[in-house]
Every structure is written in structure tokens, then in C-alpha cells.
Amino acid sequence: MPSPIEDYALIGDCEAAALVARDGSIDWLCWPRFDSPACFAALLGSESNGRWRIAPDAPVSRVTRRYWPDTLILETEFEVADGVVALIDFMPLRGDSSHVVRLVQGRAGRVAMAMELILRFDYGAIIPWVTSTVRSGPATARSVPSSVLVTHGIMAP
């Protein structure tokens, strides 16, 4: 079930935009342009319509959000029993391609994180073919004519 509309914040790159819920889930993204079909459309129904959630694995006691001054860089801070972690979301102005960047930054203590990526093209109607599920390298999700390359990494503090 989607979050109430007032719980969403906007990130964008002037050619596309995403809605990020207070729980760390991107529930809406038409990509690579505003007029493209959505690849995350949980806002229309449920997570099975596509979403990308990054959040603490433990119950959250407090959430605060803010935009960095004069930007669409969104910072969501989660407080849990064992610590504090920030999720920083943005879409940089594009060069050759569009990007969604999600950074997790530990602030205090140790916080176990969980990630769920459910790509669904055409507003949740098309389940893409994923060519790799390797945890340490890139993965590609394809459904002609759409495709998404997912890369990730863990940086030491």
C-alpha cells in the first residue's frame, strides 16, 4: 500500500523525477523522461508495481527529512535503537544518461540496512528479465525497449 501523498519528497534531474516516501522507498519514477512509462509505480497500487526501498532493518523510532540548501538532494535520517543512519537521494543533472543515486551514511552506532529493488516497466505491467543477481557487481534489467543498469558498492568508513 502506498504512503500518503504528503509523505513523499521529490528528486529530479530536470528531465525526470522520482517520489521518495518517508520509509526510504522510491514509489514513483517515470524514466528516463517525464513522459516515459513508470518503472517504479508502487504509488498506484502496491510494491509489486515496482519500488526501490532502502531502510533500516530494525524498527524506526524517528524519521527526519530535509533538502540540502538550494538543491533537490534529499536527506532522510532514520533513528533506531542501535544508532542513526542517513539515506541521501538525488538525480544528478545528466550527461549521456540518467542516474538515480542513493547513498547510505552511518551517523551513530551500528545500523543494519535492508534493500528491496522491484523493477516493473510500463507502470508495473512488465516484469523485466534480470541478467545478473550477483551481489557485488552490476545487474541489468531488460524488457524491450526498456533497460536499467544497477550498480552498487560498499565503501569503508
Regions found by a protein language model. Name each.
Residues 2-157:
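Beta-sandwich/jelly-roll carbohydrate-recognition scaffolds of carbohydrate-active enzymes
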